[in-house]
């Protein structure tokens, strides 16, 4: 008996067409273009997840640098001072302190300065 593949093919098409919901034009209606659009979108999503880490690290460094320069230290000198002082706060926490808790961040900068002065 021959095997007919109507059901499995329909399910495969439906999977891509539901994933392409909201896309413009034929990208949401035509199977082939929808499949290409969905596969490309998944590639962009994969790359975006890698770029997001890079972008956030850049943002944190910018914020730390701005906060440190208010107290007269460059970013690199500040980070070196933290290492010498034995303060192990990551960049995300330091950036949050620099933006939302300026007084606490200034105290940390002073501790880094003191460690550099030794």
UniProtKB/Swiss-Prot annotation:
Relate the protein's function as given in its record. Answer: Binds directly to 23S ribosomal RNA and is necessary for the in vitro assembly process of the 50S ribosomal subunit. It is not involved in the protein synthesizing functions of that subunit.
Protein name (Swiss-Prot/TrEMBL): Large ribosomal subunit protein bL20
Q: Which GO terms describe its biological process?
A: ribosomal large subunit assembly; translation
Q: Which residues form a coiled coil?
A: none
Tell me which UniProt keywords the record has, alphabetically: Ribonucleoprotein, Ribosomal protein, RNA-binding, rRNA-binding
Family to which this protein belongs: Belongs to the bacterial ribosomal protein bL20 family.
Q: Which Gene3D superfamilies match?
A: 6.10.160.10, Ribosomal protein L20 (1.10.1900.20)
List the gene name: rplT
SUPFAM superfamilies per UniProt: Ribosomal protein L20 (SSF74731)
Q: Name one GO cellular component term.
A: ribonucleoprotein complex
Q: Could you confirm whether the keyword Lipoprotein appears in this record?
A: no
This protein's species is Desulfovibrio desulfuricans (strain ATCC 27774 / DSM 6949 / MB)
Q: Which GO terms describe its molecular function?
A: rRNA binding; structural constituent of ribosome
Record NCBIfam families: rplT_bact
State if Nucleotide-binding is listed as a keyword.
no
């Amino acid at each position: 008996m021959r095997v007919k593949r109507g059901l499995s093919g329909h399910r495969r098409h439906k999977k891509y067409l539901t994933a392409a919901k909201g896309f413009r034009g034929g990208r949401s209606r035509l199977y082939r273009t929808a499949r290409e659009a969905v596969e490309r979108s998944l590639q962009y999503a994969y790359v975006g997840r890698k770029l997001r880490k890079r972008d956030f690290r850049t943002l944190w460094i910018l914020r730390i640098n701005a906060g440190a320069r208010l107290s007269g230290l460059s970013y690199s000198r500040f980070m070196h001072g933290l290492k010498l002082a034995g303060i192990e706060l990551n960049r995300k926490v330091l950036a949050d302190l620099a933006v939302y808790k300026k007084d606490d961040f200034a105290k940390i900068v002073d501790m880094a300065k003191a460690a550099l002065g030794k």
